From Swiss-Prot:
Species per Swiss-Prot/TrEMBL record: Dehalococcoides mccartyi (strain ATCC BAA-2100 / JCM 16839 / KCTC 5957 / BAV1)
MF terms (GO), sorted A to Z: rRNA binding; structural constituent of ribosome
UniProt name for this protein: Large ribosomal subunit protein uL23
Known role: One of the early assembly proteins it binds 23S rRNA. One of the proteins that surrounds the polypeptide exit tunnel on the outside of the ribosome. Forms the main docking site for trigger factor binding to the ribosome.
The keyword Ribonucleoprotein is assigned to this record: yes
Homology family: Belongs to the universal ribosomal protein uL23 family.
Keywords: Ribonucleoprotein, Ribosomal protein, RNA-binding, rRNA-binding
Length: 94
C-alpha cells in the first residue's frame, strides 16, 4: 500500500478541534493500514514528528430503507499525537 493511500481525509469536529490544542489530530485511514504506515504517511505528508498513534475501528450501522435493512460502511480512524511545537496547518482556521 502506497503511503499516500493510507490517509483518506482529516476528521474535523468540535471534539477534534479541542484535541488540536493538545497536539492531537484525527484522520480517516485505509482499512489495511497499521500504526507504522500511518506514522510514516503523516511524517512525510506534513513534515512533523509523530509521538503516538491511536487507532479505532468504528463499525457500520444498520439503517432502514423502507422494509429493507442495509448496512452502512464502517470507518477506521487514527488519532495522531505530535511532538510539542509541531502543528498541522491543514486544521487551522476551521
Amino acid at each position: 500500500m502506497n503511503l499516500y493511500e493510507v490517509l483518506r481525509r482529516p476528521l474535523i469536529s468540535e471534539k477534534n478541534s479541542v484535541h488540536a490544542t493538545q497536539n492531537k489530530y484525527a484522520f480517516e485511514i485505509a482499512k489495511g493500514a497499521n500504526k507504522r504506515m500511518v506514522k510514516l504517511a503523516v511524517e512525510q505528508a506534513f513534515n512533523v514528528t509523530v509521538e503516538d498513534v491511536n487507532m479505532l475501528h468504528i463499525p457500520g450501522k444498520q439503517k432502514r430503507m423502507g422494509r429493507n435493512l442495509i448496512q452502512t460502511a464502517g470507518l477506521r480512524k487514527a488519532i495522531i499525537t505530535l511532538k510539542e511545537g509541531d502543528k498541522i496547518t491543514l486544521f487551522e482556521g476551521v
